[in-house]
């Protein structure tokens, strides 16, 4: 089923705030094998001009992908989640994510198209801190694979 083109430009409500903790940053850095000292040591982060530890660049994926899930679960869009794979991901940072940040994500559908029977949706996730400052924009491409022929 083709996706509804009228959804391009639709913006979803912001997510509840996610509080970024030092331990979550440490766990994430360890999980992805990133040993940069600024991710685990506040003194190392301060030496680089940050008030506290900062998160690896891909840390926000977990909260932006969860926010993109709101788009995917919208029954009116018509995306078959059972066939969805992650196609691409890009981040554009204004500043690093820091321990203590309280972040919300607002998702907007940037593009909807069909290609070779696959449905493709591009979602922009704008991540703001509690003051409303834009921290990072995540661009996520999701692909709902074409149904297999019997």
Swiss-Prot record:
The family this protein is said to belong to: Belongs to the UPF0336 family.
Pfam families the record matches: FAS1_DH_region (PF13452)
GO function terms (MF aspect): (3R)-hydroxyacyl-[acyl-carrier-protein] dehydratase activity
GO BP terms, alphabetized: fatty acid biosynthetic process
Annotated MaoC-like domain residues: 10-116
Stated name of the protein: UPF0336 protein SGR_2883
Coiled coil, from the record: none
InterPro entries in the cross-refs: FAS1-like_DH_region (IPR039569), HadA-like (IPR016709), HotDog_dom_sf (IPR029069), UPF0336/Enoyl-CoA_hydratase (IPR050965)
Originating organism: Streptomyces griseus subsp. griseus (strain JCM 4626 / CBS 651.72 / NBRC 13350 / KCC S-0626 / ISP 5235)
């Amino acid at each position: 089923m083709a996706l509804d083109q009228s959804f391009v430009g639709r913006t979803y409500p912001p997510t509840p705030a996610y509080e970024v903790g030092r331990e979550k940053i440490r766990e994430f850095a360890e999980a992805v094998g990133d040993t940069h000292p600024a991710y685990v040591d506040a003194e190392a982060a301060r030496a680089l001009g940050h008030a506290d530890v900062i998160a690896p660049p891909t840390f926000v994926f977990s909260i932006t992908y969860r926010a993109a899930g709101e788009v995917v679960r919208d029954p009116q869009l018509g995306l078959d989640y059972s066939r969805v794979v992650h196609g691409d991901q890009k981040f554009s940072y204004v500043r690093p994510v820091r321990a203590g940040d309280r972040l919300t994500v607002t998702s907007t559908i940037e593009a909807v198209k069909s290609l070779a029977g696959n449905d493709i949706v591009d979602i922009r996730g704008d991540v703001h801190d509690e003051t409303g400052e834009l921290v990072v924009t995540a661009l996520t491409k999701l692909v709902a694979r074409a149904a297999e022929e019997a």
